[in-house]
Design a protein with these regions (language model features):
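Glycine-rich phosphate/adenosyl-contacting loop at the front of the ribokinase-like
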Residues: 1-46
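Charged C-terminal helix
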Residues: 5, 230-274
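Active-site cofactor/substrate anionic-group-binding motifs, chiefly glycine-
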Residues: 36-89, 94
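Glycine/small-residue-rich loop that forms an oxyanion/phosphate-binding "nest" at active or ligand-binding sites
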Residues: 74-123
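Conserved phosphate/ATP/ADP-binding segment of small-molecule kinases
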Residues: 105-183
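Short pre-catalytic strand/loop immediately N-terminal to key active-site residues, enriched for Gly-Thr
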Residues: 184-197
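Conserved post-catalytic alpha-helical subdomain immediately downstream of the catalytic base
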Residues: 197, 207-247
Length: 274
């Protein structure tokens, strides 16, 4: 896999084709996800009425399902959207927000996975581990520090990808991405991502943008994660001593735009693992 060549081609397609990304997302981070989608070159639509799912999906290039503020009506819309997308050959990305903290979330996410409706899962270690084991025992939506050792995260990414026949992107201080056969380890990013709301949700949006223009879902997931990581590093470099998470979030949006319009691979050094 020549990632540098493939990433460059995908970024060019993303900026030129402006794919439509249908977000069925949570109300906490919806605006941030729409903004980051536009900055990367995509075109967001945030529809969640079950009655219009078929029509909306017909005009989309990727569907992103984010269960952060799940309810029964959204579940109907999300499952319908995923089913229509699969019929049309449109990639579906799942962000299993807080799946380890609620049996409702866990059961719904597993239902989508077991029906083979998902192409890529992007979540933190605790979320992906809960999906793999089928157990919810966490707290809130943030990843638990224990278990984020590289070996454990890599094991979870590979095992979950193999179990559910899709790509798993386990993101954290170090990112682990696998399709069950190949695995990538990425070291981009910045600690300030932990101090803003929606960094994971926005990463999932970037993954969806890349999936919309890609044939290889492993490459798409990796590129979305890389764009966020490089943008975070660049945004942090622009901060002054008086700045904090608020300024960082504004800079992050700017830097996603700059990273995808003035693409460079200087900081990209993924470790590939079999």
């Amino acid at each position: 896999m020549n990632l540098k060549t493939e990433f460059g081609e995908l970024v060019s397609k993303l900026r030129s084709e402006r794919p439509v990304i249908h977000h069925l997302t949570n109300y906490v981070t919806a605006e941030s996800c729409a903004d980051i989608c536009l900055a990367a070159g995509g075109s967001p639509i945030m529809a969640d009425e079950p009655e219009e799912m078929e029509e909306i999906v017909k005009g989309a290039d990727a569907v992103l399902i984010n269960i952060g503020t799940l309810n029964l009506t959204k579940m109907i819309a999300m499952e319908s959207a995923a089913e229509y997308a699969v019929m049309k050959g449109i990639p579906v990305i799942l962000d299993p927000v807080g799946v380890m903290g609620s049996s409702l979330r866990l059961a719904f996410a597993l239902k989508l996975l077991e029906k083979n409706l998902i192409n890529i899962v992007r979540g933190n270690f605790s979320e992906c581990d809960a999906l793999l084991r089928g157990v919810c025992e966490g707290r809130g939506v943030d990843s638990l520090d224990e278990g984020e050792r590289e070996g454990e995260a890599l094991r979870v990414a590979k095992a979950a990808a193999e179990k559910f026949s899709c790509v798993f992107a386990v993101t954290g201080a170090v990112d682990h991405i696998s399709n069950g056969k190949q695995a990538l380890v990425l070291n981009n990013g910045h600690p300030l991502l932990q101090d803003i709301t929606g960094s994971g949700c926005m990463t999932s949006t970037l993954v969806a943008c890349c999936a919309a223009v890609a044939d290889d879902m492993l490459a798409a997931a990796a590129l979305g994660v890389v764009i966020m990581g490089q943008s975070a590093e660049l945004a942090a470099n622009f901060l002054e001593k008086k700045d904090g998470p608020g300024s960082f979030k504004v800079r992050l949006l700017d830097c996603v735009y700059h990273v995808t319009t003035k693409w460079n691979l200087v900081n990209l050094a993924p470790e590939q693992k079999l």
